[in-house]
UniProtKB/Swiss-Prot annotation:
Heme b b562 binds at residues 83, 182. The cytochrome bc1 complex contains 11 subunits: 3 respiratory subunits (MT-CYB, CYC1 and UQCRFS1), 2 core proteins (UQCRC1 and UQCRC2) and 6 low-molecular weight proteins (UQCRH/QCR6, UQCRB/QCR7, UQCRQ/QCR8, UQCR10/QCR9, UQCR11/QCR10 and a cleavage product of UQCRFS1). This cytochrome bc1 complex then forms a dimer. It comes from Scotinomys xerampelinus (Chiriqui brown mouse). This is Cytochrome b. It comes from the Eukaryota. It is a multi-pass membrane protein. The gene is MT-CYB. The chain crosses the membrane at residues 33-53, 77-98, 113-133, 178-198, 226-246, 288-308, 320-340, 347-367. The lineage of its organism: Eukaryota, Metazoa, Chordata, Craniata, Vertebrata.
Length: 381
C-alpha cells in the first residue's frame, strides 16, 4: 500500500513541497531564511489576529487601546511586543534572504525573483501601515510625510493624496483604512508566498556553487527539516530575547506620545528597516526625484538578471565582484545610519555619496567586474 501522503490530493501537494522535494546536497545555512520567513509570517498573522481583537481603529481610542492591550489584556504586552519585534526579525531575515539571492545568482530564476520583489513591496506596505496604527507621534507624522510623497506625481498627485487620506489631512478615515489594509495584506502576502514557492519548485533550489545540482539531490525531509528547525530555534531565541529584555530598543520613544497634529517631532523617521530607503529619498533635493529614487532603490533588484554579465552564476569563485558585494553591504549600513540622522552637514554629503555609490555598484561596477573576471579566466563571451 502506498503511503497516504503520496496519494491524498492535498497531502500530495504538501509532500512534494516539504517531504519528498529533491534538494541540492550542499545548500548552506543561507538557504534557511526562506523557512524562517515563513515562520515569521505565521507569528505575525497570529499575534496580529489577537491584537486586532482588542485594538480600535478610531483616532480618539487607538492609542488608549494599545495601552489597554499592554496593561489589561492577559499577556497582551507579550503579544504586542512579539508583533512589533517580529516585524524587525521579519525584515532582518528578508534582507539576508535577498542578499543571499544576490550573492549566489538566484535572481536568474526570473519568475521566483520577480514574485519576491512584489513580496518585498507588499511587506514594506504592510509594515508601514502597521506602524501608523498605535497612533503615536511618529505614527501620525510618518503617515503624513510618506503619504504626502505621492503629491509629487504630476497632475493627479494632490487628488491621489486626498483620496488616500479620505480628507484633507491624516485623520480618522486614514487610520480606519490603514487598519483594514494592514489586516488584509498579510493574507495577500501568504498567497504570493505560495506562488513564490510554486515557481521555485519548477526549477529547484540554487546552491552555493551556482552549478546545476540535478546529479546530486537529497530528500528535503529529514535533512533540511531538521536543519531548518535549528534555524527556527535560533530565530525564536533572538526574538524572545528582544521581546523579554529589550522590547523597545528598536522602537521610537516619540511613539509613546499620543499623536498631535499641532506638534511636529524634531526628527521624523521611519522604523530602522526603512532607513536606507529613507536616506536615498532625502539625498535628492527634488521631491519627485526623491520618490523615484526611493522606488528604484528596491525596483533595481529587478534589473539584476539583465546586468548579469558573468559566465558564472554565483560569486563563490569571483573575488572582484565579491569585494564589490561586501562594499555594497557596508554602503547599505551607512545609508541606514544616515537615514536616522538629522538633515545637516556632514550627513547630507555622506547620504548623497552613499546613494550614488549604491546605484553605481549595482548597475555599473558589478557588471564590469563580471566581464573582467571572465576575460581573466579566459571565458570567451
Amino acid at each position: 500500500m502506498t503511503n497516504i501522503r503520496k496519494k491524498h490530493p492535498l497531502l500530495k501537494i504538501l509532500n512534494e513541497a516539504f517531504v519528498d522535494l529533491p534538494a541540492p546536497s550542499n545548500i548552506s545555512s543561507w538557504w534557511n531564511f526562506g523557512s524562517l520567513l515563513g515562520i515569521c509570517l505565521m507569528i505575525q498573522i497570529l499575534t496580529g489576529l489577537f491584537l486586532a481583537m482588542h485594538y480600535t481603529s478610531d483616532t480618539s481610542t487607538a492609542f488608549s487601546s494599545v495601552t489597554h492591550i499592554c496593561r489589561d489584556v492577559n499577556y497582551g504586552w507579550l503579544i504586542r511586543y512579539m508583533h512589533a519585534n517580529g516585524a524587525s526579525m521579519f525584515f532582518i531575515c528578508l534582507f539576508l534572504h535577498v542578499g543571499r539571492g544576490m550573492y549566489y545568482g538566484s535572481y536568474l530564476f526570473m519568475e521566483t525573483w520577480n514574485i519576491g520583489i512584489v513580496l518585498l513591496f507588499a511587506m514594506m506596505a504592510t509594515a508601514f501601515m502597521g506602524y501608523v496604527l498605535p497612533w503615536g507621534q511618529m505614527s501620525f507624522w510618518g503617515a503624513t510625510v510618506i503619504t504626502n510623497l505621492l503629491s509629487a506625481i504630476p497632475y493627479i498627485g494632490t487628488t491621489l493624496v486626498e483620496w488616500i487620506w479620505g480628507g484633507f489631512s491624516v485623520d480618522k478615515a486614514t487610520l480606519t483604512r490603514f487598519f483594514a489594509f494592514h489586516f488584509i495584506l498579510p493574507f495577500i502576502v501568504t498567497a504570493l508566498v505560495v506562488v513564490h514557492l510554486l515557481f521555485l519548485h519548477e526549477t529547484g533550489s540554487n546552491n552555493p556553487t551556482g552549478i546545476n545540482s540535478d546529479a546530486d539531490k537529497i530528500p528535503f525531509h529529514p535533512y533540511y527539516t531538521i536543519k531548518d528547525f535549528l534555524g527556527v530555534l535560533i530565530l525564536l531565541t533572538v526574538l524572545m530575547i528582544l521581546v523579554l529584555f529589550f522590547p523597545d530598543i528598536l522602537g521610537d520613544p516619540d511613539n509613546y506620545t499620543p499623536a498631535n497634529p499641532l506638534n511636529t517631532p524634531a526628527h521624523i523617521k521611519p522604523e530602522w528597516y526603512f532607513l536606507f530607503a529613507y536616506a536615498i529619498l532625502r539625498s535628492i533635493p527634488n521631491k519627485l526625484g526623491g520618490v523615484l529614487a526611493l522606488i528604484l532603490s528596491i525596483l533595481i533588484l529587478a534589473a539584476l538578471p539583465l546586468v548579469h554579465t558573468s559566465k558564472q552564476r554565483a560569486l563563490t569563485f569571483r573575488p572582484f565582484t565579491q569585494a564589490l558585494f561586501w562594499i555594497l553591504v557596508a554602503n547599505l549600513l551607512i545609508l541606514t545610519w544616515i537615514g536616522g540622522q538629522p538633515v545637516e552637514h556632514p550627513f547630507i554629503m555622506i547620504g548623497q555619496a552613499a546613494s550614488i555609490s549604491y546605484f553605481t555598484i549595482i548597475v555599473i561596477l558589478m557588471p564590469m567586474a563580471g566581464v573582467i573576471e571572465d576575460s581573466l579566466l579566459k571565458f570567451t563571451h
